[in-house]
Amino acid sequence: ERELTLMLVVDVSGSGLFGSRGQSKRELAAEIASVLAFSAIRNNDKVGLILFSDEVEKFIPPRKGRSHVLRVIREVLFFEPKRRGTDLNAALEFLLRVQAHKAVAVVVSDFLGSPAQAKNEARRHVRPQMMLLESLAQASFTRLKQTNRRHDVVAVQITDRYELELPPLGRLVLRDAETGEVVEVHTGDARKREAFATRQAKTLAETARIFRSAGIDAIQLRTDEPYGAALGKFFEAREKRRLRG
């Protein structure tokens, strides 16, 4: 009988609070983590949890059992992080330290940040929350490859529609969920909205390319779209590849 270890590595940074259609990225991440945790318990696998912002906020070592999985799910749903930034490297380094044996490490995050070097370009366009997105996967490429050599890393990237395309709502005053920076944006200009959408699409495509280069299976999900069928097909395809060797 097989016995795997599933490590859920879940981003609880401030950007996860964003959601334009009634569900935040954090809420969707919690749903996905719950689905994966229950699937693991049905397969008699161990489940562990790492919650991270710009530091590791919570660690639950992997164990079996329904009560343990329910504890994991409660933490994902209700944990209140102390910090709002994001540092994927910190989470991956912690995983490498605490998990000696091979695990399936599912990283659930938007994999997007707003580093200082993006600010000037961002002000020439417009931004949701409101910074042009940068790929955290790019900054963590070396650590991702290193982690994937020891473990089987899976990336579940969660985004929101309005991070990718701005609605024509005129003048908006918005606060960056991670930095606290307040900016005023003008969404009435169609050319700026188009330029914004083009750049965001390039960032998502670059993130997907980085995962492929690191040998990591990845799926992109959105808060405004059903995820069940897509997630199921993704893991079914992974299992078929595993069985083929």
Enumerate the language-model features and the residues they cover.
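An amphipathic, basic-hydrophobic helix/alpha-beta surface used to engage anionic
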Residues: 1-63, 104-109, 115, 131-135, ...
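A structural preference for long, well-packed, hydrophobic secondary-structure segments
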Residues: 1-5, 15-21, 77-105, 114, ...
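Conserved phosphate-coordination/catalytic loops
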Residues: 27, 82-89, 127, 198-201
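Short, contiguous clusters of charged residues that form electrostatic/catalytic patches at enzyme active sites
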Residues: 31, 35, 86-93, 205, ...
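A broadly conserved amphipathic alpha-helix scaffold signal in soluble, globular proteins
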Residues: 31-38, 74-77, 93-97
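Internal, well-ordered alpha-helical segments in soluble enzyme and binding-protein domains
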Residues: 32, 68, 72, 91, ...
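Short, charged loop segments at secondary-structure junctions
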Residues: 57-86, 185
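Von Willebrand factor type A / integrin I
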Residues: 94-103, 115-245
